[in-house]
């Protein structure tokens, strides 16, 4: 059997040229052995290709790229299929074809373990085994139980077990994690005590081999079936202990006995019976699980065509891929290649997902479970969805997917549908051979198998450093922080399976080396990965001081047999030689610092005094003239007289091209952006006559300055208003790099409050050498002008210098870093930085080595990376007294010494390699130069020397392992997946680590992936599900409960075509574009909604559609004040804010943002979210325009205008009272002097003024009064610049606003009798970022003793500080009072650091409503502001028949199945999957049900954590029993009250209160000290050894002070001296375990304690208690 690939040629005549192509492999020439032309199919179309044969399987990877590069070759195919797999496929070999009944037997071992012991040190205490007939335990201590067999020694026990296996002779040996524990442990013990480990049928020992990041064990003549990888691939669980898996699969709990308990029992002799029972049950449940899972793996083995041993250890993605490859061969199809980067980018674009069911909360009886049989595969088959049928030309008939419109040919059957048809048939056979079709276990396993993605993650710990290239910039990250941040930002794109998460990424590259040439390069990162890990980790320390900590399965690159091979953390040992960089290749370019971009990244308050200036010379009237020209080009103005001047300027920028007559636009989009810039510039720019310059405040243009072409920007200066200014671009050349080096080594940047309450800034560079200070001074003055010089420092008192150094390099010694731009600068610039750093903080060690010192770990890694980029690899790192020292054992260009020989020098070939290569003894290592000399003189064999040629010519050197430290670890671990090279630089000091492989099918990199196919399948799926829901509701009486929607008049904040609108949601719905079930959809374009991202920032997100439907559900009105409310359906999610101790400080904001239904308000969530950040754009304003808007605000508040009189045509009136003189000076005189108003004069009433201005009178009538003559605020104001809105509000609040203190709290209100006007004022306040509320006086206003028929409406300011800062008052008396009131008042709201404020619901009530309800889809966040409150948008349902008995529900369900299946096309079929007697639903992912056999199934409610006490677990189990078995919620409440009462009275045995928590890191690394850490530190202080992995079992005692101080080890608990803290166990253990269950029935935490009186809250108003 010969290896081969396929080649498609442009011309068959070129085959002879192709056959002549050669490549090299291990010193021999590789070429095509022979070629033949064959007829194949490619995506269903006939094709003729050449089949190229080769001599050896390794010839294919050696030559394939050379063949592909040939000009006559279109492409090559099937070049990446491993030879062994190729053989199985081509020969049609199928394992597990027989139908024999296989004998199965499981086994498990218990071992003696002491903290810190090496694996296999402690003896095996018990071996248990189970088969169909019995479950027994063999041990060597006396235990009197019928199933226990006692022998004399451990050796006799193992011999007895081997004899049992031989006697029973099982075909299948079942273990749970036997690959990685039981077999390896048995093998170690057999070696130690001198027994041959004969488990194979031929009498030989099991073969233990590595497979990915794990081990795999083969037992010749038997199948070793390890359940662990099968279950990890198949079922999604929070933890994969045997106990958790057994309970998830069978619904029955299993006792857990911890290793420390086993050790104690064995050594004391007490409790051995319990350990024996536990051991027996381990074997028994492993056997039971094996019986359940083995048949499906056997069938899968037949389908895939691989052995069951392989299949059970493979990921789902790999299995599907190999199945398709086999079928493609059988059908004469060539397999498509995996996608290139361009195709991959297209595939990665998102599409709408499938339908999501949202269960109705509460307790329900008689629940039927209906499910589509293989929904997506059935759709694929029914509609012939396949890459080879998509948009296939020349077909007579097509099926078109709903909503997305993709077409699929029906004339010929597609490749994928044809295979899935056979698969579904096979699946039905499997189902018939297994349990009845309603078995939820079997259904669950098959369903998970279709969807499961298993990632094999070799991983690093979170603290490890990785250098990455992002958008051309080199950055150093801790891998945990980097991956966590990416996954938090793009959480909706993270693919999850079990406890593994994968996020595919773009635009990120890793530093790696080519596995073949060993040359360094930069390669794309395909994905970032994290997963939960519990096991051993290995800290590997190298001779150079480099170090890295990896999981047991993570590989580094070690030298062996002439090559670099992957060696796992568990295999690496002292003396191994690992790959580290000799040189790294970083992207290189001339770097330039763009100060404008740097300033744009700073907060607005940091740049408040920054200005841009440009000389007037040559630019007189330039800005206005340019804007007029741009408007003329757009057809909005006449041609300016000087247009030619501006057209020439635009031509120079590339926007237009001048002709002999006229011009043409060459860049329309660029021109539009340029105009947007000038619209703002003309508003913002002002003339400074003193300096003959134009001046612009940076903040006025910060959001448009990026639009300024570089050719223009370079003419400006940037700096502080009254201080130093500099060019906006700084070239990063040698001098600037050296100055940065000086700063990083011995500089600091500082800012402080000065005596005027402003900020002062300075940068200082220190050195004792006056010549160095001279150089520092010269460089600093070149870039920053005049500086100050002290005895041993240079001071740069410039804010711009502070900004540059602080942002590029950091400020404190502990956080200094190499500036990003230095890494990618030319080599001479990098050397200049190193020189500056060396002069500032380096020295020459007595050993003639350069020594660089720093306190910053980030800087150490940056220096090493920088030196590596310069080809310097002879580096040694040491850490002493808090200081890192980097020793460089090479001559550097700027040092004036000659390096002498030194013991540490990486540019040598280690003698161990020389001895292995040449087969003789070498006395010492040899330098590269000496080695070449020895080879050239033929003293060394030239042919043998070629084996290590890569070491001389590559970019990798070897570093010896000094020590390996092993410790346990539990927590997240991380990895990258790097394209092609499969390695990346990582760790402290940087060394090469192997990356993760991850396989998948149905994702963008799969061979047969088709984005349009996936999009169409989900669209059809949504359509069929919603149609089915509609039918079951309308025709069969099932109630459909939608989990969404708000009422039609609800106002939302949108931006349409760039303009902000406050619009009723029903007004967005203009037409019905399509229907799904009873829901109607209107597609929107150019609409964005205001929403909140997970970082707490207000952002605009696209709204693709608005949806509406009729509902018969309850509608609730949530009242915030007596006039501010929100109407929502009963189960619509609002976004609440957890402002409690339940969320620990420092946790991401998204952990505080929780979805909450109206009925849950007032329980754990008491506050909702309202916006509190400016969303109106800012400009550089005209001061007179500000005064005009202040006047308009005063008029709306205390003015009058309009009417039929002659006076009204020319005047407006303003009532000013005692404030007349102040307003006259501040507003009226300046407006009169500038001609905005003609005049003003006193009226008859004191303080009243008439303002003469014909245009103003017309303007106020046209825009500020409605048809009835009432005052209003026009909609155009919602899109005014922020400063003008603030000016208007300032005038309005000055007229009608009040300032007061109420119960010591500052109060600011605006009062009117016009609700519509007040509502508009609220919108303006939101636009400028001032949170507010509104309420109406319940008592009517009175005038002259009589009711006036009006009520006062108060707009109340929530964020008073923001109001004072941005708006304030015109009147000194009000402004002074506000300042005094706020003087001693500071807001403690944590929310104020984000873009929102909190609002507290006052009441929830049901209302009558008969109309459409609406929802919008908001991309990315799925949230929008409705009536000023943040809500969630969803789209799901859950259905049942309320009140019907079990038989009726079953009968109706089956009738419906018969009806709907007759209507569904093709293979689509709805199945009866099960029936549940009772169930309750907390949310869509948290529920519990009980079937007719009494089996309880839970999801999302399990307590499996070690750090919960037995009393918490026991109470939750009893609560579930009461609700599900007895249907009695009140009984469940009584149980909780009873437990809390017993706890309070100290009637609970202390054994049930023990909490077990593991130490996961070194004690010194803990910042927060939990109880277990506090105990561990006290134990360590006593001399007891505490390592990561140690489990602390403790109990919390009654008393005052920190919990950690009151927690003691349980073995120190003395009931005669100690009392446990009942309150702690009630509040932190028992109630949290049951609260999330019972809150579904309206109970609050305080109602579950026996001693508390019952309180009535929002939940009581909603009458949610009891069952439905």
Swiss-Prot record:
Keywords: Autocatalytic cleavage, DNA replication, DNA-binding, DNA-directed DNA polymerase, Endonuclease, Exonuclease, Hydrolase, Intron homing, Multifunctional enzyme, Nuclease, Nucleotidyltransferase, Protein splicing, Repeat, Transferase. InterPro entries: DNA-dir_DNA_pol_B (IPR006172), DNA-dir_DNA_pol_B_exonuc (IPR006133), DNA-dir_DNA_pol_B_multi_dom (IPR006134), DNA/RNA_pol_sf (IPR043502), DNA_pol_B_thumb (IPR042087), DNA_pol_palm_dom_sf (IPR023211), DNA_pol_type-B (IPR050240), Hint_dom_C (IPR003586). Disulfide bonds: none annotated. It catalyses: DNA(n) + a 2'-deoxyribonucleoside 5'-triphosphate = DNA(n+1) + diphosphate. Its EC number is 2.7.7.7, 3.1.-.-. One of its GO terms (biological process) is DNA-templated DNA replication. Residues 739-872, 1191-1330 form the DOD-type homing endonuclease domain. It comes from the Archaea. It holds the Pfam family DNA_pol_B. This protein undergoes a protein self splicing that involves a post-translational excision of the intervening region (intein) followed by peptide ligation. PANTHER family: DNA POLYMERASE CATALYTIC SUBUNIT, DNA POLYMERASE DELTA CATALYTIC SUBUNIT. Belongs to the DNA polymerase type-B family. In addition to polymerase activity, this DNA polymerase exhibits 3' to 5' exonuclease activity. This is DNA polymerase. It comes from Thermococcus hydrothermalis. The gene is pol.
